[in-house]
Swiss-Prot record:
Provides the (R)-glutamate required for cell wall biosynthesis. GO terms for biological process: cell wall organization; peptidoglycan biosynthetic process; regulation of cell shape. It catalyses: L-glutamate = D-glutamate. The gene is murI. Its EC number is 5.1.1.3. The keyword Membrane does not apply. Disulfide bonds: none annotated. GO terms for molecular function: glutamate racemase activity. Substrate binds at D9, S10, Y41, S42, N74, T75, T185, H186. It holds the Pfam family Asp_Glu_race. This is Glutamate racemase.
Amino acid sequence: MKPTILLYDSGMGGLTIYDAIRENLPDAHYLYCFDNAYFPYSEKSEAVLIELAVGIVQKIAENYPLDMVVVACNTASTVVLPALRERFAMPIVGTVPAIKPAAQISQTKTIGLLATKGTVTRPYVDELIERYAKDCVVERIGSTDLVEIVEEKQQTGSVDMRRLQKVVEEWQSHPTLDTVILGCTHFPLVKEELQQLLPRVSFFVDPGNGIANRVVSLLQDVKRNVNNENKENQAFCTQNSENFLKREKVMQNWGFKRLNILNFVEK
């Protein structure tokens, strides 16, 4: 039987995680929800992020028996995982910055963490750096603008390079930075553009493959809820908007039949 896997993010950046999982589990039944009503998550309070996460998973679980939930958002994952695991029985997989592998591959022991403002300031990230990158210098850039740049690229196919350059300009002349962690699920979608702007950087690291391996491992022990052999992949957003049709086209290009509006209201 096909497992049903829900992925959610504030936007469409979590599709990079979906893509990595789908490569390993091409026949699974996928649900993807982006919370555009509260996009971006980067500067939302922890209480709001938890409330949104629980509400979204609860609403979708009412209509779809879920075998797994993947929080395809670094910002949310640094906050909401304990609350989701306490509330729901299915496995919950989070997305956190790939600090451990970055520290292992950096030759100069100088790493850049490129993430949202919310992620770079979380104590959880400090703990990861202390645990896995104690011998490294970790520079941080927190950017909400970069998330919006990626969302625009997904809908238009183009990137404003001058706007992108402003995000990373402080790293362009850095003498020893050789590894950059793409600490937001949106950011792998502009990896090529970042490589152009940061030619001295040898490694760009994102957690997609690691998360996919974790999902595959956990599903081996999961008892499947129902037979989903003929179920179509479905996408959800939490608010209608003027660019709804563009977003629906993006989701269809990623293999989702249609984009539905989830009637979700923050409690």
